[in-house]
């Protein structure tokens, strides 16, 4: 099972604002230290920034980007800017080193995760407003028995190499009717890309409570509250958004993904604050995992290169690490 939200979801609006502030920091310094928390909704936007370069003097620029991303002209900005903690700042004086403690992993995305991400992106292209989507593979024993009720025994069902499990798909999309959604999204095309028959959707629910508008006057958004949507089964601890690349939550998670995509394997890692190198296990869930070590400076550079490739921290925050494959 997997849940994906689009960039107009209130929590993603908070992530995007945090990302835009990190972009601002990188426009001021080549290697800034910044951490941002955003809480937004019902006419208020509360932001706390710990930074080496952003101060209260940047309030006008921050208000401008808040209005642009939230699409709210009348919003009250409560901004607090503080300097980074001295001990944390000293950790980065001589060279870039691990900025925090953490465990990290990359799990190769499932068909469900990739499929739903592309469904979400297809809908967002047509209806760029608040949306949330859920897919569930109905594979419990009771469902299997019902699906193969003509079989002689459940034993035969369980040993089938590729049982055709049915799916349940829920689409909650604001500002669109059921008919509009079904007409606008290339649902059959996306299914064909992933080899999924449309007949496998035993349940398809669109806006279970009816037409809705969503947005920041219905729900409140907070930074890093949709990590499941951003990372799928790769979620461990810290958040991806509102942080510079000295933070392991950003850099090591991205590097795990880059290694995982290169080797087509699951990857794990851990590090402690101040570490100059990070050790990885490529294929950590296999019998003979491959050990790999990389300097933190190289990891941070690779992560920043990736962020720049997708268009910056604000663009990265739109979809997280699960960004979809359809073009």
Question: What role is predicted for each listed range?
Answer:
Residues 55-62, 177-185, 288-294:
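Short, conserved charged micro-motifs
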Residues 1-35:
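N-terminal, positively charged regions that mediate nucleic acid binding
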Residues 1-8, 37, 44-53, 101-109, ...:
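Short glycine-rich or small-residue beta-strand-to-loop segments that form or flank ligand, phosphate
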Residues 40, 44, 71-217, 318:
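Glycine-rich, mobile lid/loop segments that gate access to catalytic sites or pores
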Residues 264-327:
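Internal helix-turn-beta structural module
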Residues 17-25, 59-73, 186-197, 251-263, ...:
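Short, non-transmembrane amphipathic alpha-helical segments
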Residues 30-45, 149-163, 265-281:
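Short edge beta-strands and adjacent turn/loop segments
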Residues 225-267:
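C-terminal catalytic subdomain
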């Amino acid at each position: 099972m997997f849940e994906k939200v689009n960039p107009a979801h209130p929590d993603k609006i908070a992530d995007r604002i945090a990302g835009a502030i990190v972009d601002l920091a990188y426009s001021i310094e080549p290697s800034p230290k910044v951490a941002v928390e955003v809480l937004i909704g019902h006419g208020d936007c509360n932001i706390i920034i710990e930074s080496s370069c952003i101060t209260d003097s940047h309030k006008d620029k921050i208000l401008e980007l808040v209005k642009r991303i939230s699409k709210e002209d009348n919003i009250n900005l409560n901004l607090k800017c503080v300097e980074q903690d001295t001990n944390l700042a000293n950790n980065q004086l001589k060279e870039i080193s691990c900025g925090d403690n953490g465990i990290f992993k990359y799990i190769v995305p499932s068909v469900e995760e990739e499929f739903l991400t592309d469904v979400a992106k297809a809908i967002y292209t047509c209806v760029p407003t608040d949306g949330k989507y859920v897919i569930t593979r109905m594979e419990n024993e009771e469902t299997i028995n019902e699906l193969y009720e003509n079989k002689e025994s459940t034993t035969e069902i369980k040993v089938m190499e590729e049982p055709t499990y049915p799916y349940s798909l829920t689409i909650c999309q604001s500002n669109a009717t059921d008919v509009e959604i079904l007409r606008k999204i290339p649902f059959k095309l996306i299914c064909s890309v992933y080899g999924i028959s449309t007949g496998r959707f035993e349940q398809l629910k669109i806006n279970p409570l009816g037409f809705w508008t969503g947005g920041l006057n219905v729900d409140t958004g907070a930074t890093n509250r949709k990590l499941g949507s951003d990372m799928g089964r790769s979620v461990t601890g810290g958040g991806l958004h509102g942080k510079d690349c000295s933070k392991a939550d950003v850099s090591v998670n991205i590097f795990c993904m880059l290694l995982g995509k290169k080797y087509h394997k699951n990857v794990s890692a851990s590090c402690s604050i101040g570490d100059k190198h990070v050790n990885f296990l490529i294929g950590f869930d296999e019998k003979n995992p491959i050990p790999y070590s990389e300097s933190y400076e190289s990891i941070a550079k690779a992560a920043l290169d990736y962020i720049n490739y997708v268009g910056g921290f604000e663009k990265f925050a739109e979809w997280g690490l699960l960004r979809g494959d359809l073009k």
